[in-house]
C-alpha cells in the first residue's frame, strides 16, 4: 500500500497539519514542528498537544506515515565546534518535540563542510552529532535525506549515507529519505526502466532498502547531475512522469511516507490523485 501526501503548513499550530493533509486527500504528510528558520521556539503547550492528537485521530493518518522535517539552520557537520553544538542543541529539541507528538521519525539534511574541512571529517561530525542525540532520546528514527550536492552540502552520494549509517551505534534509530529531485540532480537517473533499476540496485547494494524510511516526490527544474536543488511540479520538470509511475508500482516503497514538496501547492490534491491512479 502506498501512503502519499505533501509537506503541509502547520501555521497557527502543529494540529493544523493533519487538517491540511486531509483537505488534499493525503494519506501521509510532512510538517515542521516549529519555525524552520529560527533556532529556538517556545515549548509545545498542553492545549496544542491535545489538539494535535485529536486532529491526528480524525485524519486517520498513522504516525509512521508522517515525516517531520527539522530546521534549515541546523548543520550537524559544522566545522566549527561551537556552531555545531548550537546545531546539536536545536536538533535535540526537534527530536524531543517528535517524542511529545508521538512521531517515530525526523527527517533532516545531513550537513555541510563549508569548504573548511574534508568531506570525511564532516561526515564524522554528522555521525557523532547523531549518536549524541540518539543517546539522549528514544523512539525517534533520525532520517537522513539525500541532497542535490549544492554548495558544500554532503549526502548527495549513496556512499555518504552509508558512511554515516555505519558510524551510528544504534542502527534501529537511523533511516534515509530519498528525494527524487535531489537524487536526479546529484546524477542518479530514474527516467527509464533501465536507469531506474540501475539506480535502485545501487541504492540497495550501498545503503539498503531496510533503511528507506520515507521519500520526497519531486520533479526537477535542473538537468541530471547539475548539483542544483530546484523542485518542479510532477511531469513538468526534467524527470518526467515515467519515474513516478515506476515508484508507484514498486513494492519497496510501500508503507512509508511519500511526500510531495512540489512547487504549486494548489495542485497537490491533483498530483496525489494522479499518483494513486498510476498504481496497477
Swiss-Prot record:
GO biological process: one example: base-excision repair
SUPFAM superfamilies: Xylose isomerase-like (SSF51658)
Catalytic activity: Endonucleolytic cleavage to 5'-phosphooligonucleotide end-products
Keywords tagged on the record: DNA damage, DNA repair, Endonuclease, Hydrolase, Metal-binding, Nuclease, Zinc
Residues binding Zn(2+) 3: 182, 229, 231
PANTHER family named among the record's database cross-references: APURINIC-APYRIMIDINIC ENDONUCLEASE (PTHR21445:SF0), ENDONUCLEASE IV ENDODEOXYRIBONUCLEASE IV (PTHR21445)
The protein's name: Probable endonuclease 4
Chain's gene name: nfo
